[in-house]
């Protein structure tokens, strides 16, 4: 079992149950999935960027990426409907917990001048989105093989009903929030 999942079952569930006084154990919020998205506008001119981004995202997450395509045409960006413009990965179960563990304990502390992540990036329904400016903070990425620095969005989807519950869940799991 993943280390973070063990922590969730042993400690976090009891803490959340006492903090929010849930009547049923099934009411306790849990992490449903983690979506890692890399949007690449430069892929319009150079499709090779998308291949390297997909390979890097697969190395970071340990799962095959899905190429995302443009939903509609935008003439000012020279974008046609159906053109590949990014890649994403949806993590669930064991890979999700392992990725979150590596993100919170290894990757985020490697960010320059890291003081913690913002506690305000919740969407109103308990889900948390985190933006990362460069993929080099992940130890799986070889610094010499990187052709261009690319950022990514990481969305942690929880079953929490409010932001307060979602924040408590992530805080107890070890997310380094800024004070």
Swiss-Prot record:
Keyword Nucleus annotated: no
Which GO biological process annotations does it have? translation
- Keywords in UniProt for this one? Ribonucleoprotein, Ribosomal protein, RNA-binding, rRNA-binding, tRNA-binding
The keyword tRNA-binding belongs to this UniProt entry's keyword annotation: yes
**Assigned GO CC terms:** ribonucleoprotein complex; ribosome
Which family, according to UniProt?
Answer: Belongs to the universal ribosomal protein uL5 family.
State the function annotated in the UniProt record.
This is one of the proteins that bind and probably mediate the attachment of the 5S RNA into the large ribosomal subunit, where it forms part of the central protuberance. In the 70S ribosome it contacts protein S13 of the 30S subunit (bridge B1b), connecting the 2 subunits; this bridge is implicated in subunit movement. Contacts the P site tRNA; the 5S rRNA and some of its associated proteins might help stabilize positioning of ribosome-bound tRNAs.
Q: What subunit structure does UniProt give?
A: Part of the 50S ribosomal subunit; part of the 5S rRNA/L5/L18/L25 subcomplex. Contacts the 5S rRNA and the P site tRNA. Forms a bridge to the 30S subunit in the 70S ribosome.
**Which HAMAP family does its entry note?**
Ribosomal_uL5_B (MF_01333_B)
Its name, as the record gives it, is Large ribosomal subunit protein uL5
Q: Which organism is it from?
A: Pelobacter propionicus (strain DSM 2379 / NBRC 103807 / OttBd1)
In the UniProt record, what gene is named as encoding this protein? Answer: rplE
């Amino acid at each position: 079992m993943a280390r973070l999942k063990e922590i969730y079952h042993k400690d976090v569930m009891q803490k959340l149950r006492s903090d929010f006084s849930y009547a049923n154990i099934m009411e306790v919020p849990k992490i449903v999935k983690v979506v890692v998205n890399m949007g690449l506008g430069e892929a319009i001119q150079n499709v090779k960027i998308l291949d390297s981004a997909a390979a890097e995202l697969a190395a970071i997450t340990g799962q095959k990426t899905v190429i995302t395509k443009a939903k509609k045409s935008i003439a000012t960006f020279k974008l046609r409907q159906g053109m590949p413009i990014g890649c994403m990965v949806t993590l669930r179960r064991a890979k999700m917990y392992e990725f979150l563990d590596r993100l919170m304990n290894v990757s985020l502390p490697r960010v320059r001048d890291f003081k913690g992540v913002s506690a305000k990036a919740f969407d109103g329904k308990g889900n948390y989105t985190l933006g990362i400016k460069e993929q080099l903070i992940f130890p799986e990425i070889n610094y010499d093989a990187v052709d261009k620095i690319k950022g990514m969005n990481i969305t942690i989807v929880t079953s929490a009903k409010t932001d307060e519950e979602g924040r408590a869940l992530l805080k107890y799991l070890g997310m380094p929030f800024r004070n």
